[in-house]
């Protein structure tokens, strides 16, 4: 089962926490769809800024959005000009007062989502999939990861039939709940179709093993 389930969802409440931090008795569905709309918009709008994750906190008619990114300068802009533009665009999607908090991801090589997006970008630039996977695995392990597994699925190398190839180095214990495993998914839009890229990154164990 550990092979199939989303590693972050599997560990929620154990060592991982939710990306949407709010509680609603009435308009739960409405707020959930609003969250999805905001996330999709930000992902598209800030695609080249290396956005790792987006956290949304809500309280009393206000929405605080935490954006974790590898390139905060691109989002903030000169004297915060870009942030103001972004706030106005987000205000159109929600009737709440929006606060933006930009946080830098100091080691993008240790962030599964950013690694997946990096591999996807390489595939779009027609770099051989094995080379792209190997390069990312090597650089991630160099930065101190305990293990990584990258899976590419689709018409690899323009082949007639789609297939799945994966490359792993180190340990990736999917069943161990105390194992801090980061998960990222990205899609490479190539001339042959879409290639899916999944990354599982093992950073070490969080809770000490019970004696």
UniProtKB/Swiss-Prot annotation:
Record keyword Cell inner membrane present: no
Top-level taxonomic group: Bacteria
Pfam families, per the entry: KH_2, Ribosomal_S3_C
Keyword field: Ribonucleoprotein, Ribosomal protein, RNA-binding, rRNA-binding
InterPro entries recorded: KH_dom, KH_dom-like_a/b, KH_dom_type_2, KH_sf_prok-type, Ribosomal_S3_C_sf, Ribosomal_uS3_bac-typ, Ribosomal_uS3_C, Ribosomal_uS3_CS
Gene Ontology annotations for the cellular component aspect, listed alphabetically: cytosolic small ribosomal subunit
One example of a Gene Ontology biological process annotation: translation
Subunit structure: Part of the 30S ribosomal subunit. Forms a tight complex with proteins S10 and S14.
Role, per record: Binds the lower part of the 30S subunit head. Binds mRNA in the 70S ribosome, positioning it for translation.
Name of the molecule in the record: Small ribosomal subunit protein uS3
Organism: Citrifermentans bemidjiense (strain ATCC BAA-1014 / DSM 16622 / JCM 12645 / Bem)
High-level lineage: Bacteria, Pseudomonadati, Thermodesulfobacteriota, Desulfuromonadia, Geobacterales
């Amino acid at each position: 089962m550990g092979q199939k389930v989303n590693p972050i969802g599997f560990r929620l409440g154990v060592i991982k926490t939710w990306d949407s931090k709010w509680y609603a008795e009435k308009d739960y569905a409405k707020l959930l769809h609003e969250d999805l709309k905001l996330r999709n918009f930000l992902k598209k709008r800030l695609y080249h800024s290396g956005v790792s994750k987006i956290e949304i906190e809500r309280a009393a008619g206000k929405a605080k959005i935490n954006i974790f990114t590898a390139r905060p300068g691109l989002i903030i802009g000169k004297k915060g000009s870009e942030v103001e533009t972004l706030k106005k665009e987000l205000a159109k999607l929600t009737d709440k007062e929006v606060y933006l908090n930009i946080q830098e991801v100091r080691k993008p090589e240790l962030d599964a989502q950013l690694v997946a997006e990096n591999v996807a970008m390489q595939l779009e630039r027609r770099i051989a999939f094995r080379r792209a996977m190997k390069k990312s695995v090597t650089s991630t392990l160099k930065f101190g990861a305990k293990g990584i597994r990258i899976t590419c699925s689709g018409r690899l190398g323009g082949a007639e039939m789609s297939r799945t190839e994966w490359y792993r180095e180190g340990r990736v214990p999917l069943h161990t709940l105390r194992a801090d495993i980061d998960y990222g998914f990205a899609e490479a839009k190539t001339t042959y179709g879409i290639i899916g890229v999944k990354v599982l990154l093992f950073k070490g164990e969080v809770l000490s093993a019970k004696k």
